[in-house]
């Protein structure tokens, strides 16, 4: 090929495309949407809840009498104080109408909120219902490392449809 053939080819090409308009871009470029801060926080909460709470773990809990549990190394006097209602719960979680998966997330969020707000005691109302949450909530609480103890709540805080939970808030001075 020489330069004359090249110029002639370009001239023919220019003559052919004369008057043609370029096509406007109508294709969509799909990009994965960026996750919002709320979605990231929700996913993180689910991950924490799933890592702490297992549905297959069966701890040794009392069959008769009030529902109660005390972590190793915690003074039994703390359980007695919970039973008598000496601790006033700062936070209250009502699980009425929740599914198990939702209840797990809410329970994990409650424990995180207690630690963040330096609340040593909280109340979890699981209700009566079909008894599923009433059975599962104590089993989940036993598995969480921040839970020191729990006891069936006094009548004023829900009776046998609720639990008072004692949370380990770290080295901060204890409040009642």
Curated annotation (Swiss-Prot):
This protein's record includes keyword DNA damage: no
Pfam families (alphabetical): Smr
GO biological process: rescue of stalled ribosome
Class of enzymatic activity (EC top level): hydrolase
Organism superkingdom: Bacteria
UniProt-recorded Gene Ontology molecular function terms: RNA endonuclease activity; rRNA binding
SUPFAM superfamilies named in the record: SMR domain-like
Biological role: Acts as a ribosome collision sensor. Detects stalled/collided disomes (pairs of ribosomes where the leading ribosome is stalled and a second ribosome has collided with it) and endonucleolytically cleaves mRNA at the 5' boundary of the stalled ribosome. Stalled/collided disomes form a new interface (primarily via the 30S subunits) that binds SmrB. Cleaved mRNA becomes available for tmRNA ligation, leading to ribosomal subunit dissociation and rescue of stalled ribosomes.
Summary of subunit composition and partner proteins: Associates with collided ribosomes, but not with correctly translating polysomes.
The protein, known as: Ribosome rescue factor SmrB
Source organism: Shewanella oneidensis (strain ATCC 700550 / JCM 31522 / CIP 106686 / LMG 19005 / NCIMB 14063 / MR-1)
